[in-house]
A protein has these predicted regions:
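Hydrophobic anchor at the beta1->P-loop junction of P-loop NTPases
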Residues: 24
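Conserved lysine of the Walker
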Residues: 32
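Hydrophobic positions on the alpha1 helix immediately C-terminal to the Walker A/P-loop
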Residues: 35, 39
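Short glycine-rich substrate-engagement loop in P-loop NTPases that contacts/grips substrate
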Residues: 54-86
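Interdomain motor-coupling "hinge/lid" segment immediately C-terminal to the ATP-binding subdomain
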Residues: 128-251
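Accessory nucleic acid-recognition modules appended to NTPase machines
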Residues: 201-375
Length: 437
């Protein structure tokens, strides 16, 4: 079994003094159903699972129930599991197919006899009202593909290594060179394998890159099917075109999405909701341009200027030629890792709670990422994939600008930890050391 960080959050939810229903959100194929089942097997005597896609007739259970007692009677007739108060988890899966759950969950929680877990895909587009459940009734946990640390766990790398990395990050100390080289090798693997559980499981089992790429293509095919099934009919072609264009757009020099690639003379206003669909479905990650790199970043966001990434770097690398994937796996220094590195960093920062922005100025240059930490400090980040990682004109210009008051910049690249002036250089695998959860 793959070890996941969300397990700690599930433990905290169960031990909280005030009971709430649990909602685990995230893209399809990231392991939501598996992790809830595994958690339930460890902590409950009985698990009642209702899947609204496998059994669509179950939606009728929630057709105007009078109260919790009436609904629980219906549930007991629908499942083959005894509902024992205090010892049963009732798990509603694929809840995007049962919008009535929004009204039902409040009185089920008030009843108090059982614990409830909800999960599903595309909740951001299909079940927006789920987040309108009154405060105190629902605990929402976001789940993502495996980050680099979780991937390393699958490769038998323990917490002691990451404790050491956290110390090096905090104290700006070099990582032991042997450990650094080993982690860079693992990071090259991660760039190809990514963090989709089925892909990682396959790689752990047989090490076959061919099998990895087949599973990755199947996942992307499933995402395309979701577009055909859940998006509005008039939007489907554009949404699919946008999704399929991500790899080529990230290979452009500025990586910014060009609307004319979707359709000649296309304007943002015509497809704004199509980009939102992909982001809200958790299959894409957006970084928005800002007018200036100052807090609060959200206030100067330009919605029509953005970079779009896949939710998993393995899906991106799997879109390129097999030779490219093998070159990445081998750490070939002659290829351009730019888009792959940047997608991996975007994915990592998003999984650690950050909204993503970037800054582009004709005069000052472009910063790959801007994030805002818990203290509302803006942190500029450049991602470099080659030996020239110490060349960063935009970073230097922005840090020197008297109106921006930025004290420190970070460069993530194929390097060890070092500090020169107000720029901190970090190995790219340290992107996960930034936290905003």
């Amino acid at each position: 079994m793959l070890r996941r960080k969300i397990e700690t959050q599930l433990e905290a939810w169960r031990s909280a003094p005030k009971r709430t229903a649990l909602l685990v959100t995230g893209a399809r194929q990231i392991g939501k159903t598996y992790i809830i089942r595994h958690f339930a097997q460890q902590h409950y005597d009985h698990i009642a699972e209702l899947n609204f896609i496998e059994n669509p007739d179950l939606v009728a259970l929630f057709d105007r129930p009078r109260d919790a007692k009436n609904l629980l009677m219906r549930l007991e007739l629908a499942v083959n599991t005894p509902l024992v108060p205090g010892k049963t988890l009732i798990f509603f899966d694929e809840v995007q197919r049962c919008k009535e759950m929004v009204t039902a969950i409040k009185f089920l929680v008030d009843d108090g006899r059982f614990d409830y877990a909800l999960s599903g895909s595309l909740l951001g587009v299909e079940l927006e009202d789920i987040r309108s459940v009154p405060v105190g009734y629902l605990t929402e946990l976001d789940m993502y593909p495996l980050d680099f640390q979780e991937f390393c766990w699958s490769q038998h790398i323990g917490n002691d290594v990451f404790d050491m990395l956290a110390e090096c990050f905090a104290k700006h100390q070099e990582v032991d060179e042997f450990i650094h080289q080993r982690l860079m090798e693992l990071y090259s693997k991660y760039l190809v394998i990514g963090g989709m559980p089925a892909v990682v499981d396959s790689f752990v089992a047989n090490g076959s890159v061919a099998d990895v790429r087949t599973i990755q293509e199947n996942i992307k095919r499933e995402y395309r099917r979701d577009i055909s099934q859940y998006a509005r009919k008039e939007d489907r072609l554009h949404i699919r075109a946008i999704y399929d264009l991500v790899p080529s757009e990230l290979n452009n020099p500025n990586k910014r999405f060009t609307f004319a690639k979707i359709e000649k003379n296309m304007r943002f206003q015509s497809v704004a909701s199509d980009f939102d669909w992909l982001v809200n479905a958790d299959v894409a990650v957006a970084a928005y341009n800002v007018d200036e790199p100052c807090t609060p970043l959200e206030m100067s966001k330009e919605r029509n200027l953005f970079k779009l990434f896949y939710n998993d770097v393995g899906l991106l690398t799997g879109s390129f030629l097999k030779k490219t994937a093998l070159d990445v796996l081998d750490g070939n220094p002659d290829i351009n890792y730019g888009s792959i590195y940047e997608n991996a960093v975007a994915q990592e920062l998003r999984a650690h709670g950050f909204d993503l922005y970037y800054y582009n100025s004709k005069k000052l240059g472009e910063l790959d990422f801007l994030i805002q930490d818990r203290n509302d400090h803006v942190l500029p980040i450049e991602v470099k994939s080659g030996k020239s990682y110490k060349r960063h004109r935009a970073m230097d210009n922005v840090l020197a600008h008297p109106e921006y008051h930025l004290n420190t910049g970070y460069v993530l690249g194929p390097c060890n930890v070092s500090v020169e002036g107000n720029v901190t250089y970090l190995p790219v695998y340290m992107a996960g050391m930034f936290h905003n959860e």
